[in-house]
Amino acid sequence: MSKNSELYFFIGLRIKQARTNTFGHRLMTQTELAKALNVSFQQIQKYEKATNKISIEKLDKIAQYTKKPLAYFLPHTVVDSTTISG
């Protein structure tokens, strides 16, 4: 599995986890989340299975809707100490 595939697999898993609690009880359905994002429930399925890549904008909307920080959906990464200035 490529790094890119692993990333989207991780994101998909986190989307599903955000919809359900650790005991598997439903917090929201794919349909409910889809309506909030103005996409089909099939699109949510594809995000969760990493069949389709999700944009950062959609991921941010999922984070807002599920009340999770955006970082929750991304694997832990370490950024070097180099300062980037604009």
Summary of predicted features, one role per range:
Residues 25, 51-54, 65:
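Helix-turn-helix/winged-helix DNA-binding modules
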Residues 13-32, 36:
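Short basic helix-loop element that most often maps to the first helix and adjoining turn
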Residues 37-54:
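Recognition helix of helix-turn-helix/homeodomain-like DNA-binding domains
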Residues 1-11:
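A detector for short, charged/polar N-terminal pre-domain segments
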Residues 30, 41, 56-59:
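Helix-turn-helix DNA-binding elements, focusing on the entry/boundary residues of the two helices
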Residues 1-2, 74-86:
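Short, charged recognition helix plus adjacent turn
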Residues 57-72:
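DNA major-groove recognition helix of helix-turn-helix/homeodomain DNA-binding modules
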Residues 15, 33-34, 44-47, 73:
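Conserved hydrophobic/aromatic packing and binding residues within compact polymer-binding modules
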